[in-house]
Amino acid sequence: MPTPGTGSVPELQLVPFQLGHFPILQRWFATEKELVQWAGPALRHPLSLEQMHEDLAESRRRPPLRLLWSACRDDQVIGHCQLLFDRRNGVVRLARIVLAPSARGQGLGLPMLEALLAEAFADADIERVELNVYDWNAAARHLYRRAGFREEGLRRSATRVGRERWNVVLMGLLRQEWAAGGAGND
């Protein structure tokens, strides 16, 4: 089981998500498209704490089904990310990864992702980490490839946002690839 708060890199530390972080997170999504890009189609704009109750409940189970993290720099919340556990199969899904608009473009995406991967693989039973990303999100796909993820498949027309249909790319990283420093597959 990952130890909360151990995933840190220079200038950035992951800390367990607290209810006091929610108002900060909520401000980062001005439109439905921004919210769906982050959370998938399950949540509705505007984001409300009530919508996150299921995530929070899953984080309180023993063992937790989900861990919610805030990324902090200089005691300021500048990001959010989650781990979803499929312990039976030794798989973790990275989910709901976002940096504050003011923190983007500063090279913080990879350190946050590396800290999150360290948390995921701290559990010796985890063999695989995977994620979904929309195919049009070239910056995120590039970041994930830099961290060692490989594109493994495409779910066409998987998400509806208004009148648009978005394709979803499945990406995965195995423990041995991560341990070997799988970064640089871009």
Curated annotation (Swiss-Prot):
InterPro entries: Acyl_CoA_acyltransferase, Bact_Acetyltransf, GNAT_dom. CoA binds at Q37, I97, V98, L99, G105, N137, H142, L143, Y144. It is an enzyme of class 2 (transferase). It holds the Pfam family Acetyltransf_1. Residues 12-176 form the N-acetyltransferase domain. Its EC number is 2.3.1.-. Homodimer. Keywords: Acyltransferase, Transferase. Catalyzes the transfer of an acetyl group from acetyl coenzyme A (AcCoA) to an acceptor substrate and releases both CoA and the acetylated product. It prefers the antibiotic chloramphenicol. PANTHER family: AMINOALKYLPHOSPHONATE N-ACETYLTRANSFERASE-RELATED, AMINOALKYLPHOSPHONATE N-ACETYLTRANSFERASE-RELATED-RELATED. This is Acetyltransferase PA2578. GO terms for molecular function: acyltransferase activity, transferring groups other than amino-acyl groups.
